[in-house]
């Protein structure tokens, strides 16, 4: 009877371990995917500058209470989409902090965006991050370059790191499964 109780407890704990493993793996994949560069092709339709502090854009409801910086925002109409398929990008220097893009040229990119906006040129923008209107999150722009109408938006680095990351997690999951099988054999 004691053997059956141990086996039931082990099988339940194995499900819990794999549940925790899946949660950690999913969070890790989303985290890595968030910081990998992504390419989007479209037309720059607008730009703006907002003075911000650590709490976000400065306004009458959020007065400045510390050091402030200018954050550039660039609007992009995505190529091949309808008029509602737009993307707003934050254009902020990362300097030498996380993520390590070592980006110091936000003012230069802002000037390029204004140039391409006036000439209505098709551009390819590189960015990382996600857009969430609920949390006021914007992807951060890392590069702007002119594009032609058949250019690919596929990023080989993004594909490589996503596949590598998933392969590592599959390996860890396989090792975890084999370890639990060994423990189950020892219970028998």
What residues fall within each predicted segment?
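Aromatic-rich, lipid-facing transmembrane alpha helices and their immediate juxtamembrane interface loops
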Residues: 25-29, 37, 143-150
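Juxtamembrane interface at the cytosolic side of transmembrane helices
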Residues: 9-13, 151-188
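Alpha-helical transmembrane signal-anchor/signal-peptide segments
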Residues: 30-56
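Short, Lys/Arg-rich, polar N-terminal cytosolic tail immediately upstream
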Residues: 1-8
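Membrane-proximal loop-to-helix boundary features in eukaryotic membrane proteins
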Residues: 4, 131-165
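Hydrophobic membrane-insertion alpha-helices, especially the h-region
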Residues: 14-33, 169
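Long, solvent-exposed extracytoplasmic domains/loops
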Residues: 48-146
């Amino acid at each position: 009877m004691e053997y059956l109780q141990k086996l039931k407890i082990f099988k339940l704990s194995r499900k819990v371990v794999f549940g925790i493993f899946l949660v950690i793996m999913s969070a890790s994949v989303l985290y890595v995917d968030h910081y990998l560069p992504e390419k989007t092709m479209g037309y720059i339709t607008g730009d703006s500058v907002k003075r911000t502090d650590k709490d976000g854009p400065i306004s009458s409801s959020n007065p400045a209470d510390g050091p402030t910086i200018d954050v550039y925002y660039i609007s992009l109409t995505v190529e091949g989409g309808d008029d509602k398929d737009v993307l707003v990008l934050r254009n902020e220097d990362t300097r030498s902090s996380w993520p390590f893009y070592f980006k110091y040229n936000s003012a230069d990119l802002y000037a390029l965006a204004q140039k391409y906006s006036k000439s209505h040129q098709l551009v390819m923008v590189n960015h990382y991050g996600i857009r969430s209107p609920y949390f006021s999150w914007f992807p951060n722009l890392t590069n702007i370059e002119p594009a032609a109408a058949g250019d690919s938006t596929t990023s080989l680095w993004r594909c490589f790191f996503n596949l590598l990351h998933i392969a590592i997690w599959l390996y860890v999951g396989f090792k975890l499964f084999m370890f639990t099988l060994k423990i189950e054999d020892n219970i028998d």
